[in-house]
Structures are given as C-alpha cells and as structure tokens.
Amino acid sequence: MLTLSKQTDYALLALTYLSAAGRAANTKEIAEQHDIPIELLAKILQKLTRAGLLTSAPGPTGRYRLARSPGTVTIGEVVKLIDGPPALAQCMRPENAVCGQQEKCTIRAPLAAINARIMLLLDHITLAEIEIGRAHV
C-alpha cells in the first residue's frame, strides 16, 4: 500500500506549523511542538529550503519561514521532494522498471492509472487546505 515516510509526515507538520504561525520559527521550536527528532528535522528543513519552499536566516539560531503562499504549496510537491514519486507497486519504482512479468502482467496498467490519479489528487491539495482542515478529496 502507498505509505508516506515519516520524513514526509515531519515535512508536512513543519510546513503547516510555519503556515499557521504566520511567522518565522527555528528548528528547535518546531521539533518541540511536534516531538520530532531535531537532527532529522534540521535535514528536512534544509531540503525544503533548497527546493524553495522555505527561506532561512543564517546562523545557529536561524529561523525558517514559508517562501511561498500556503495556497501554492501542494502536498504532492512535498511528497515527491521528500520520498520521490509514489508507487503502488514495486515495478513502478524507477529502480525496478524492468520486470520479468511485464509481458504477461495484467495489473501494471490499471495500477499505473490509479497511481496517476492519487498523484493528481495530491497535486491539487494545498498546504492552506490542510492547515484549515478543508482538503477536498
């Protein structure tokens, strides 16, 4: 089954925290608010910053803030950034693209279509919708 990693959970928690707060916050504050290991959160926040989702102030007490409006950040964007493209079946992962059953497989195409619909849904749910609890599925 399609499962998001703990890192993606933490990234979404941090992003929604910053969005709801409407201000900059440091790694320690976010980690304490959500009981996230601070070292892991620091790596996730750096990744989000490199991707342009956050801005950061330099220094040991550096603070992070959203770089974009919460209405323009999609859950799909965060999932792909942290976990890579989701896949319902192992054969849909880039590292498993060649499958010995491919010629006889009757489920790959339907699963690929389902996978595409899931990504389409995630690409249309924004951080703003998650924050206010109004994600329409």
Q: How would you name each of these model-derived features?
A:
Residues 18, 44-49:
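Basic amphipathic alpha-helical segments that dock to polyanions
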Residues 39:
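Key DNA-contact positions within bacterial/archaeal DNA-binding proteins
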Residues 2, 6, 10-36, 55, ...:
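N-terminal helix-turn-helix DNA-binding core of bacterial DNA-binding proteins
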Residues 32, 49-50:
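Alpha-helical residues within the helix-turn-helix
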Residues 67-134:
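Non-DNA-binding regulatory cores of transcription-related proteins
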Residues 51-67:
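Beta-hairpin "wing" of winged helix-turn-helix
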